[in-house]
A protein has these predicted regions:
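Rieske [2Fe-2S] iron-sulfur-binding subdomain
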Residues: 1-78, 112-203
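Glycine-rich active-site/cofactor-binding loop and its immediate structural neighborhood
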Residues: 59-107, 111
């Protein structure tokens, strides 16, 4: 059975005065949540942060979304999104918002990546003092990138890389901002509500 058929279907009501919604399990069931992460949250565009938070080259921000750790990275030219795991032993690379300079270094075996996700160093990967063994291709072991789009100050990602172009996907949302000159909006402050024990569909 396909993953789509496993998801709960919303019934169409023949009576316009009757509304059917999702069953209670869709808000509290762990398996349902995992299915959402692999379908609806993987297929579309997800908001993950603001570009103004990544001002300098080397600024990084870890984000946990749809059950996956990612990291946003600013280099001299652009902002990238990567899976926040080392290509060697899958250890988390970045645990806090900070500036890493020119290199993202794994705290386990010191595998090091540049700000475009390319592997630059893999100490002793071939044995003691064997840092560049024959047959080991550095280009095959970079960070796994994630499709990203920046709309004004908002950063969006798409996990499976198959989403429609952002402007097409988000057309109904963008339409609501037609009367607002977004270029004049200025960041004022951040309201941090901490961790909220709820389901994403309530937010």
């Amino acid at each position: 059975m396909s993953r789509e058929k496993n998801l709960v279907k919303i019934k169409k009501s023949k009576n316009p005065n009757t509304i059917f919604g999702l069953p209670a399990k869709s808000y509290i069931d762990e398996d349902f949540w995992k299915q959402e992460c692999e379908t609806v949250l993987s297929d579309g565009w997800l908001f993950v942060g603001f570009s103004h938070e990544l001002k300098k080259s080397g600024d990084v921000i870890p984000v946990f979304i749809a059950n996956k750790p990612i990291v946003l990275v600013r280099n001299r030219d652009d902002i990238f999104a990567f899976h926040n795991v080392c290509s060697h032993r899958c250890l988390k690379l970045v645990n806090e918002k900070k500036n890493v300079g020119k290199i993202i270094r794994c705290p386990y075996h010191a595998w090091s990546y540049d700000l475009k996700g390319k592997l630059k160093a893999a100490p002793h990967v071939g044995g003691t003092n064997q840092h560049k063994p024959k047959g080991f291709n550095f280009s095959d072991h970079g960070l796994k990138s994630i499709k990203i789009h920046i709309w004004h100050d908002w950063i969006f990602i798409n996990f499976n890389g198959k989403a429609k172009k952002f402007e097409e996907y988000a057309r109904p949302l963008i339409k609501k901002f037609d009367d607002i000159d977004l270029t004049k909006l200025k960041y004022a402050t951040t309201l941090d509500f901490g961790k909220i024990n709820t389901n994403w569909k309530f937010l």
